[in-house]
């Protein structure tokens, strides 16, 4: 007997993506640029206990995400030398996008299995709430970089 075939969303499938790049300024003097990214949620496989015993591969969808990055540049000329100063801000609005999710909820901060955990189930020195609210399931926080570049 042949198995029933079906189309299954791949782990990286994403229905909607939007990338917008905006730059203004005077090239060689100053520029400011922003990159906006939006993406609908990617699939994950739900826990069959939550989906009434029916398990569909990649049947759940993670939350949407968005991000804004900023770059500002200013160039100075000194006796034939060019000095470029810049500011980079990754995740400008410090958004906590949920990239990893629990299969029981589809969220990064709620695990319905947490009610059944005991302290001996948790590896390390974390409490159960600390274990559930795992920072590695979120996007990186805001990061600010200042820099200098030299040219001849």
Spans of features found by a protein language model:
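Short structured motifs
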Residues: 5, 55-56, 71, 131-133
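Residues that define the transmembrane beta-barrel architecture of outer-membrane proteins
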Residues: 14-18, 64-68, 81, 140-144
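Active-site-flanking ligand-binding surface segments in enzyme catalytic domains
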Residues: 56-82
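C-terminal beta-signal and adjacent terminal beta-strands/loops
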Residues: 29, 38-49, 75-152
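Preference for bulky hydrophobic residues occupying beta-strand positions
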Residues: 24, 34-36, 70, 87, ...
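C-terminal extracellular loops and terminal segments
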Residues: 1-64
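Membrane-embedded beta-strands of outer-membrane beta-barrel proteins
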Residues: 20, 70-72, 146-148
